[in-house]
C-alpha cells in the first residue's frame, strides 16, 4: 500500500510538471503570435497550422528545463523579460513611432518572455557544459596566416571602392588643416585631421594627386585595423580553442561589409575603434596574463592607448572616465597603480584639449547642443504631441532657451536625429541659466514621462533594437555611408575625391548590400548587421559575469558601458559611432563561451 502511494505521488508530481509545461508552451506560442501580430493579421496567425508545430516545439523545450537550477532560471527569466521588452517596444517604435501603453502590450511582453525562456535556458546549459579543450597550436603561424588572409580580402574591398570612402566629414577635416585662413576648431579630432590632411597632401607632393594621397591614408588605416583584428581573432582563439569562434572572427574581419567598408572609410571613428579594441585587449591581458606586470611596457602602453583614443574621439574621455569607480570597486591587486594608469592619460588629455589647444590656436566649439541632444528631443516631442503641458511661463522659458520654437515641428519628421532641434539651442542663454533649463526640462518630464521616454527610445532606437529597419527617414542619414561625398557641392574649395573602382563587380555587390539594404533579405545573417544585436550580446555578457561572479571583468565591461552611455546621449544612431562594438564582438563572445580562469601569454 505504501509503495502504491509513493508511486502515485511520483506520478502526480510528474503530471504536475507535464501540465505546467503544456500551459507554458501555450503561453509561449501566444507570445510568438502576439509579436508577429504587430506585422500582420492576428486572425491569419491565430488560425495558422504552424502554431501547432510551434506549440509542440515549445513543449519539447520546456521539458528540458531543470527547474531546480534556481540561479540559471532566475537569470534566464530576467534576461528573457528584458529581451522581450526590447522586441515588443522596439517593434512598436520602429513601425509606429510610439508605444501602446496598455495592458495588451504588457501581456505581449509577458507571453513573449515565456517564448524566450527555454532558448536562454538551452544557451546557459550549453555554456555550463562547455569546456575549453587544450590544443597545441602554433599561434605565431596562425597569427601570420590570419593577418595575411584578412589583408588579402580587405584589399579586394580597397580595389572595389578605390581610393577609399570619402565621407561627408572628411572634406572639411582636410580643408581646415590645409587652408591657412580657416579657423581650427575642436569639433573634430585635431590629431586625426592632421594625419588625414597631411597624408592626402603627401600624395599631391609625391604623385601630383590628392586621390593617391587619400588612397594611401585609407590603405594605411586598413593595415592598422587588420593588425588589431588579427590580435582580436588570436585572443578569441586562445581563450576558447574553438574553431567556430576563430572562423567567425576571420570572416567578420575579411568579408563582413560593415567592417571592411569602415576599415577603408576616412573617419575618426575607424581609428578610435582600433584603439578602443587594443585598450580592451590590454586590460584583459592585465587579468589573464601572469607576466603582465613583469613587463613595464604593458601598463605604459595601456596609458598611451587611452590617451590616443581620447585624442582621436573627444567623447573618449567620458568613455574611460566611467571605468574609474569600477577599478576602485573590483580591482583587487595593484588597485592604485591601475588607477594611475587610467587617470594619467585622462589628465594629459585635459591638458591637451585645454592649454595645448589654446597654444595651437584651436577654438573650442560649444558642446552645449551635443550635450542637450536628448533633452531637446524630449522637449520637442512634448511640444508637438502634448502642448498643453506647457503653461505660458514654460513657453516663455522655452523661447528663451531656443531661438525659434516654431521650428520644433521639424521633430515630427526627424524623431531619430536631434540635429534640427539641438541646432535651435541658444547657447548663451542656456549656459548663463543652466539650472533654469534643467528645472524646465525636469518639470515637463514629470508632467509627461510617456513622451519623454518615447523621445529617448526613438533617438537611440538603432543602438538597442536588433530588428531595426533601414533606411529610416526619421534619422535622415544612411545607416552606413557608402556613396562618396560630393565635395564641390558643399564647398568649392574642398578637395574633390572621386570613386574609381578597380573591381566593379564587388563595388556593385557592396552597393546593393549597404545602400539598397539587401542585407535585410538574408535571415539570421541580417541580425549581425544591426547594432541592437551587439547591445543584447553586451547585456548578456554582463549577466553571465554576475552569474559566474567574474567581478574583475566589470572593469573592461565598464569601458564598453561608458561608450554606450556616450552613444545613448548622442544626436543620432549611426553605425560608425558603434563600430568599436563590432570590432570587439569576437571578444565578447569568447568571454561568454569560456568560463575558465585561464592565463594567456602576452597579447
What are these regions (language model features)?
Residues 161-175, 183-199, 207-212, 580:
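Extracytoplasmic catalytic/substrate-binding loops of multi-pass membrane glycan-assembly enzymes
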Residues 118, 216-240, 278:
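Transmembrane-helix motifs of polytopic, lipid-linked glycan transferases
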Residues 118, 178, 271-290, 304-306, ...:
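Specific aromatic-rich, kink-prone transmembrane helix
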Residues 361-503:
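Membrane-proximal stem/loop segments at transmembrane-domain junctions that anchor or position
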Residues 34-53, 212, 216, 459-556, ...:
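Membrane-interface anchor segments at the N-terminal boundary of transmembrane helices
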Residues 70-73, 77, 141-145, 230-255, ...:
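Transmembrane-helix signature of polytopic, membrane-embedded enzymes
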Residues 1-28, 49-83, 94, 98-154, ...:
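Start-transfer (signal-anchor) and selected internal transmembrane alpha helices
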Residues 298-313, 324-325, 343-349:
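Membrane-interface alpha helices of multi-pass inner-membrane proteins
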